[in-house]
Amino acid sequence: MAWMAASSRIRPAGLRRLPGVLLLAVLVLAGAVLAGTGCSAGSRPAASTAPRAPAVAAAARPGPAGRYLALGDSIAFGYRPPQVRPAPDYYDPADFTGYPEDVGRALGLSVVNAACPGETSASMINTRAPSNGCERNAADGPGYRPSLPLHVSYPGSQLGYAVGYLQQHPDTRLVTIGIGGNDLFRCQELTDHCRGAVLSQTLAATTANLDLILATLRGQAGYQHTLVVVGYYAVNYRDLPFVHQIEALNAALAGPAARYGATVADMFSAFRAASAGHGDDTCTAGLTFALPGGCDLHPTARGQQLMASVVERAIAPVTAW
């Protein structure tokens, strides 16, 4: 969800996000970290400016079971907010690991993680479409990708990269896609509570975009192996208005998944069950980050591990590699 980060405004039940000030906070933090090395945020040492992410043609060697391409937003990216300790190194994408890396290790797959914090279902298709902080933030300022490195570098859209990657790597055996959370957050940011007809219109667009994304992966990219649509969880399951929005989002994702033979990884039920003994609060359960003033919606290492286990269970009946 921006799937990106947190703002100074506390959302219902402690839900926090940071569409407009995330990048500023991240760059200030990065500058503070670099101050001890005599460098500014804009003058990273030469040894660290070399591209870390491979191009499509130079992707990692396949693991024993093949390749795994992860697509999505900040959750798949493994984003951690700047307030956590130890502070993340935003100039080093290897400092961020999410459920894709856990899944890859468990299944013996080499992972290429193309996720971008703040990606929406529209910006995944077209970089000029509104994002929630990947290319641009909600205030139309520069986003994450123009300013900080992703796990893998690519010039166009995330979907465009996926098509090229899958065409060049037919030994790819797993693709996961977690997208749509930032569609909901943009709706919350730009409208009054994102409900009723406005919510329905937002989710209809999400469904249409995911339809196009999955059709492109199956058609143009020619990918016919295991495909997983990763659902979303609630932060606090006692916050019924937000719970209902997440349920509606997951329902919007389920239709395209079924149409294109994708398995759905049910994060909503998994996080609800795991937080049941903690007041139905994922933050109290240690699944999302507890920050001063509220709960950040991004998963902790424990939360990412839970997500990985849900993905692994979801694909167990359909994997054949």
Predicted regions and their residues:
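Surface-exposed intrinsically disordered loops and tails
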Residues: 84-94, 126-154, 277-294
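Structural recognition of the beta-strand scaffold that forms the well-ordered cores
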Residues: 67-72, 76-78, 110-115, 173-178, ...
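Catalytic His-Asp segment of secreted/periplasmic serine-dependent ester chemistry enzymes
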Residues: 232-321
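Active-site segments of SGNH/GDSL-like serine hydrolases
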Residues: 181-182, 191, 213-248, 269
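Oxyanion-hole/transition-state-stabilizing segment in secreted/luminal serine hydrolases
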Residues: 77-81, 129, 133-201
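Secretory targeting and sorting signals
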Residues: 2-51
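Short amphipathic alpha-helices and their capping/turn segments at secondary-structure boundaries
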Residues: 55-67, 102-105, 154-175, 213-220, ...
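Serine-esterase "nucleophile elbow" of acetyl-processing enzymes
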Residues: 48-134
